[in-house]
């Protein structure tokens, strides 16, 4: 497993927000006491990044309604470089002081692996001192093609972690093959995204957790939301069953989507909680324009940076 120690130790410090964070080798430690205030939208610790609205899956539950008729935003590498040039970074002794984001997750508005600039974009983000991660349905990775090999090579060289979605049952053969290839690659952390909607979806998550063991860093649980193409949400009583099964099986390598926060506040499962969108925002990266939105569920821009 490759590490990011060569990125150094980084610190982001906003005393007026009661925020003090140290990052090293893909781990973030937030220091201090009391509650940190929401960070400025243009200086978030972490961003979800949308580089297209195009997708090769068109899942019925997609919360952004991405389709095969969507678009790949052009010149994303140049736009990223221009945006990163607006941040500051300085070294004090052995610590890098910065207001740059520590990491990003690519794929908030479409399937990133089908963007023609994607591999180059991973390199561009990496060379800017920010760790690129991405979410995928697994189709491109799973296929035996030159593009798949190029993507695996770029992932091996530049990426911190890959999240493979298991939400669409018809695509799971692709998702499984993608995970097999990532495991064989051995150079990146692997997560699985599970959409939790009913009792059966919980049972399927437990089954996959048992099957993969410690090969998966985190199983990320996302509640079905009535957004985009989905018209329904998680069924009543499913959270209680999920909570019971996690405790019964002593599952520790699990993470929860932000929309579970209300359940987690009173849950028996011990987790670190912070307000939704307080340290992160979503970005839509188009040609010479960065649009910052509250989240990937709310794509209404709250800040636009034009170059």
Label each PLM-derived region with a short phrase.
Residues 38-82, 86:
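Canonical Radical SAM [4Fe-4S] cluster-binding loop centered on the CxxxCxxC motif
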Residues 115-116, 232:
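Active-site cleft segment of glycoside hydrolase catalytic domains centered on the general acid/base Glu
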Residues 70-74, 161-305:
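Radical SAM enzyme [4Fe-4S]-AdoMet core and its adjacent flexible, acidic
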Residues 58, 109, 286-289:
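Residue-level recognition of short loop/turn positions
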Residues 80-84, 88, 118-122, 148-152, ...:
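Generic structural signal for well-ordered alpha-helices
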Residues 46, 65-78, 94-115, 125-143, ...:
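Core AdoMet radical
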């Amino acid at each position: 497993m490759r590490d990011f120690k060569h990125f150094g130790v980084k610190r982001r410090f906003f005393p007026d927000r009661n925020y003090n964070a140290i990052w090293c080798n893909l781990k973030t430690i937030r220091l201090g006491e009391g509650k940190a205030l929401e960070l400025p939208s243009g200086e978030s610790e972490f961003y979800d990044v949308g580089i297209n609205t195009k997708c090769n899956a068109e899942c019925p539950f997609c919360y952004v309604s991405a389709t095969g008729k969507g678009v790949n935003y052009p010149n994303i590498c140049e736009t990223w470089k221009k945006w990163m040039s607006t941040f500051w970074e300085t070294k004090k002794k052995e610590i890098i002081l910065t207001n740059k984001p520590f990491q990003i997750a690519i794929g908030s508005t479409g399937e990133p692996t089908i963007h023609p600039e994607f591999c180059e974009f991973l390199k561009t983000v990496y060379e800017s001192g920010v760790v690129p991660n991405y979410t995928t349905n697994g189709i491109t990775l799973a296929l035996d093609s030159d593009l798949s090999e190029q993507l695996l090579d770029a992932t091996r060289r530049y990426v911190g972690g890959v999240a493979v979605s298991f939400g669409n049952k018809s695509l799971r053969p692709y998702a499984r093959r993608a995970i097999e290839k990532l495991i064989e690659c051995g150079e990146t952390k692997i997560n699985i995204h599970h959409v939790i909607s009913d009792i059966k979806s919980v049972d399927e998550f437990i089954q996959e957790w048992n099957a993969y063991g410690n090969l998966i860093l985190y199983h990320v649980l996302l509640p079905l939301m009535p957004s985009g193409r989905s018209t329904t949400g998680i069924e009543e009583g499913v959270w209680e069953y999920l909570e019971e099964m996690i405790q019964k099986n002593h599952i520790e390598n699990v993470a929860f989507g932000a929309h579970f926060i209300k359940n987690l506040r009173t849950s028996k499962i011990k987790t670190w909680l912070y307000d939704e969108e307080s340290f992160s925002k979503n970005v839509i990266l188009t040609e010479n324009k960065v649009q910052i939105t509250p989240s990937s569920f709310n794509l209404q821009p709250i800040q636009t940076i034009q170059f």
